[in-house]
Design a protein with these regions (language model features):
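A structured, mid-to-C-terminal "fold-capping" secondary-structure block
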Residues: 168-237
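Residue-level signature of catalytic and energy-coupling elements of molecular machines
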Residues: 52, 123, 231
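Mid-length scaffold segments of soluble, non-membrane domains
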Residues: 94-164
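Bacterial signal peptide processing site
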Residues: 17-20
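Alpha-helical transmembrane segments and their juxtamembrane interface "caps"
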Residues: 56, 110, 140, 150, ...
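N-terminal Sec/ER secretory leader and immediately downstream segment
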Residues: 22-104
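C-terminal motif of bacterial Sec signal peptides marking the signal peptidase cleavage site
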Residues: 12-15
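Positively charged n-region of N-terminal signal peptides that target proteins for export
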Residues: 1-4
């Protein structure tokens, strides 16, 4: 009886394997398995995040790309205008901007493990939601899972760049705090309120960190769109199988 059972089992497995081979040979649609969807989505996320982090982590990854270059907030224009009036002032301002972007580039080099942790923990349900979601579904998943940890990675590096001296022993942060402190005193006074002046509440290092992360996720979204729409961007068989179906 046991021999008959194992013989039938062997025949069944052989038939299944042959059927799969025939379906693949003649390009007959084979439904995606849960394993394929999960593996394909994890690979897509790995490719997308590696590409984004590598590009932004290179010299001028942020600084040389106008789409993601991190600039001082609009409220800092008065600082920029005043420093620009002194000899060499424009270079001082641009040096600050460059240092901020260099800090973001350094942080991007270390973003990989943060993304990999989120990718590793992705469930089957997450995978199907991403597969059947919009063109930014994978990016949105990563944003939700990694943003706080990435903020903690980027923020200290940007904070350090802001604490460096720019002119006369004064750092960007000190100039910012002095400027906004004086402005807010006026804005919050009776005369300021009568004139409808608004206090500046921008936390400079937090603002710049958010801008850096906006750029990172923009690049990931671009890569996701490519993988979904362009067969050339599907660099291996599992991506072709999942996104080509």
């Amino acid at each position: 009886m046991k021999k008959l059972y194992f013989a039938l089992l062997a025949i069944t497995f052989t038939a299944c394997a042959e059927l799969t081979t025939i379906m693949e040979t003649y390009d007959i649609d084979v439904p995606l398995t849960e394993y394929e969807v999960s593996s394909g989505l994890k690979e897509a996320l790995r490719v997308g995040t590696d590409s984004a982090a590598t590009r932004l982590g290179a010299i001028n990854g942020y600084y040389g790309d106008e789409l993601v270059k991190i600039m001082l907030p609009e409220e800092a224009s008065i600082i920029v205008d005043n420093i620009s009036k002194i000899p060499g002032g424009n270079k001082l301002v641009e040096d600050v901007v460059m240092r901020i972007n260099r800090a973001a580039e350094d942080a991007a080099k270390e973003a990989g493990p943060v993304f990999w942790g989120a990718i590793k923990n992705m469930t089957i349900t997450d995978a199907f939601n991403i597969l059947n979601g919009g063109e930014k579904a994978a990016t949105d998943y990563l944003h939700k899972q990694t943003y706080d940890e990435l903020f903690k990675l980027y923020n200290p590096k940007i904070q350090t760049s802001l604490d460096k001296e720019i002119v006369a022993g004064i750092s960007t942060n000190e100039s910012w705090e002095s400027l906004t402190g004086k402005w807010n005193t006026i804005a919050e006074s009776p005369i300021g309120k009568f004139a409808d002046l608004e206090a500046v509440k921008t936390d400079l290092d937090a603002y710049l960190t958010e801008k850096a992360l906006d750029g990172l996720f923009m690049k990931i979204a671009q890569q996701e769109k490519l993988i979904r729409e362009d067969p050339v961007a599907r660099v291996n068989d599992i991506l072709k199988r999942v996104f080509g179906s």
